[in-house]
Amino acid sequence: MKKIVIGIDVGISTTKIVGIDASGMVISPIRIKATDPITSLYGAFGKYLHDNRIALDEVEHVMLTGVGAAYIDERIYGLPTSKSEEFVADGLGARYESKLDRMIVVSMGTGTSLVKCDDNEIRHIGGIGIGGGTLAGLSRIMLKTDDIKQIINLAKDGDVSKINLLIGDISAKPLPGLPMNATASLFSNAKANASREDIAMGLIWMVLQSIGSATILSSLESGIKDFVLIGNLTLLPQCREVFPAMEKLYGVRFRIPKYSEFCTAIGAALDYKRQTK
């Protein structure tokens, strides 16, 4: 009996895949890297079915989303296959994982998109061209590597105060609403001989703080105080430093759900149920 809906978030080089069973449970999400979206998709799908001992006739439907989905117009392994609009998938997945009905979803990928969820309304409200691609590109120039594991390891020994200018550097007293350790200017305190460790930390903070600030600004006049972070950048350890500091400063809540990396794939699978109601 067909029970499982497969959601696949197809990137250019990375594909994420999840299954959702009849009870609504998420089954063993995985990610696969490859040189192109077709190889990535079929590699991920085959591995997923094999690892979870799922037969083809147990799959009710396959839902595709993500930029790489545009390259695929055929049925996957002959199975019924449809597509989910990526921003809708972002919203559905984040709503499912966070259990919130009203929020802004912050999809931190190569760049960053912002999706407003207000009960059943899911709407893309903008974004910024800063994200994982920014971190990788600047790291290639400044650190001579775009290996995210190496960047994270360097940042562990970095001191962001040697890179960013803080309020305490320019004022003898806190400013209204701004404590002494708040950032006045990103990278403004960097020296010509800054260490690779400090640069790595500064780059990560710059990307995360920029995303956080854009998110808060996007929420003005909406009354929304809950922001759900999804995508690969949620795996950065510095998220546990940057976003709590912004929560305290602005009175908002940044949430990283359990399957933050896979929310878009989860949302794609959920969209099938929504489309067939």
Regions found by a protein language model. Give the residues of each.
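Conserved phosphate-binding catalytic cores of ATP/NTP-utilizing and phosphoryl-transfer enzymes
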Residues: 1, 72-106, 111-121, 266-274
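Short glycine-rich, Thr/Ser-proximal phosphate-binding strand/loop in the N-terminal lobe
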Residues: 2-43, 122
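Short beta-strand-loop/turn "lid" adjacent to the catalytic site in phosphate-handling enzymes
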Residues: 30-34, 45-46, 50-86, 119-124
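Glycine-rich phosphate-binding loops at beta-strand->alpha-helix junctions
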Residues: 64-70, 217-246, 261
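Conserved phosphate-binding/catalytic loops in two-lobed NTP-binding clefts
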Residues: 81-87, 244-266
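Glycine-rich phosphate-binding/hydrolytic loop that grips phosphoryl groups
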Residues: 92-97, 135-139, 254-277
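Glycine-rich phosphate-binding loop plus the immediately following alpha-helix
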Residues: 120-175
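Adenine-nucleotide phosphate-binding core of ATP-dependent small-molecule kinases
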Residues: 176-226
